[in-house]
From Swiss-Prot:
Pfam families: Ribosomal_S2. HAMAP family: Ribosomal_uS2_B. The keyword Ribonucleoprotein applies. GO terms for biological process: translation. This is Small ribosomal subunit protein uS2c. Belongs to the universal ribosomal protein uS2 family. GO terms for molecular function: structural constituent of ribosome. It comes from the Eukaryota. One of its GO terms (cellular component) is mitochondrial small ribosomal subunit. The lineage of its organism: Eukaryota, Viridiplantae, Streptophyta, Embryophyta, Tracheophyta. It comes from Buxus microphylla. The keyword Ribosomal protein applies. It is found in: Plastid, Chloroplast.
Length: 236
């Protein structure tokens, strides 16, 4: 895998608060190699290491995208939800930003059935067929469609399991992580100072609570995907 330059700036990361971790009492000792200091009861992440692993993640994503691979971005907490959706749409990735439904990947056949139902209901809505049904039936199907849109809207075009999954918050997305581990799907994960760096293939030490921090990391990752996709299109 060729190493590339991704314009990862330490000063920019500091301005975004990427280096701020959790309180020193709320930490995972396995994160010790990624912590540079303690300040006012808060652990400070070593941004040099953040830059290194972020660069490695960008290289991996570029390489995968340039070979036509598919990606899934997962981030369901309120602070991350909108950022995840906009980043995924920009890079034409699948995403989950409301709730990870248990078995979404490990029980893929059930997820596929739900997706087929979702697509059918969307088609019926677009052709105004729902409007021609009895009110009670139409209301029930509209509720069902709304539910499916909330939880499956970001993966509505997904026809197979993703090649790489990007996780925004390890603590919040443990079920998704466990399913990826079970299936052997490679993961890139943002890890704060209370996380386990050994769960993902590439762990990026960063503040996973600040919106500016999440936005910066996601922007770098999806930029790599976009560049990789452009390379894939040029070389087809």
């Amino acid at each position: 895998m060729t190493r590339r330059y991704w314009n990862i700036n330490l000063e920019e990361m500091m301005e975004a608060g990427v280096h701020f971790g959790h309180g020193t009492r709320k930490w995972n000792p396995r994160m010790a190699p990624y912590i540079s200091a303690k300040r006012k009861g808060i652990h400070i992440t070593n941004l040099t290491r953040t830059a290194r692993f972020l660069s490695e993640a960008c290289d991996l994503l570029f390489d995968a995208a340039s070979r036509g691979k598919q990606f899934l971005i997962v981030g369901t907490k309120n602070k991350a939800a909108d950022l995840v959706a906009s980043a995924a749409i920009r890079a034409r990735c699948h995403y989950v930003n409301k709730k990870w439904l248990g078995g979404m990947s490990t029980n893929w056949s059930t997820t596929e059935t739900r997706l087929h139902k979702f697509r059918d209901l969307r088609a019926e809505q677009k052709t105004a067929r729902l409007a021609r049904l009895p009110k009670r039936d139409a209301a029930m199907l509209k509720r069902q469609l709304s539910h499916l849109q909330t939880y499956l809207g970001g993966i509505k075009y997904m026809t197979r399991l993703p090649d790489i999954v990007i996780i925004v918050d390890q603590q919040e997305e443990y079920t998704a992580i466990r399913e990826c581990v079970t299936l052997g799907i490679p993961m890139i994960c943002l890890i704060d100072t209370n996380c386990d760096p050994d769960l993902a293939d590439i762990s990026i030490p960063a503040n996973d609570d600040a919106i500016a921090s999440i936005r910066l990391i996601l922007n770098k990752l999806v930029s790599a995907i976009c560049e990789g996709r452009s390379s894939y299109i040029r070389n087809r």
